[in-house]
UniProtKB/Swiss-Prot annotation:
Gene: sec61b
Segments passing through the bilayer: 36-56
Compartments in which it is found: Endoplasmic reticulum membrane
GO cellular component labels: membrane; Sec61 translocon complex
Residue intervals on the Extracellular side: 57-61
Pfam families: Sec61_beta (PF03911)
GO molecular function, one term: guanyl-nucleotide exchange factor activity
Record topological domains on the Cytoplasmic side: 1-35
Keywords: Endoplasmic reticulum, Membrane, Protein transport, Translocation, Transmembrane, Transmembrane helix, Transport
Taxonomic source organism: Dictyostelium discoideum
UniProt entry tagged with the keyword Protein transport: yes
Keyword Protein transport: yes
GO BP of this protein: cotranslational protein targeting to membrane; post-translational protein targeting to membrane, translocation; SRP-dependent cotranslational protein targeting to membrane, translocation
Subunit structure: The SEC61 channel-forming translocon complex.
Name of this protein: Protein transport protein Sec61 subunit beta
């Protein structure tokens, strides 16, 4: 089966000087969190889970 030919927009290449990957755009809605805050929150979450495991081990006995 032959597909109908459609025109596609040419692929664009970012030729700007900023080669750092953008995690969010300025126009996007929602919470804008930097990588340092994400790392800090994930470490807090891991510590909280470890504390819950330790508390569960001692309260079950």
């Amino acid at each position: 089966m032959k597909r109908p030919s459609t025109q596609r927009a040419p692929a664009t290449v970012n030729k700007g000087g900023n080669s750092m990957m953008k995690f969010y755009s300025e126009d996007a809605i929602g919470l804008k969190v930097g990588p340092t805050a994400v790392l800090f929150m994930s470490l807090i979450f891991i510590a909280f889970v470890i504390i819950l495991h330790i508390m569960g081990k001692y309260t079950r006995s």
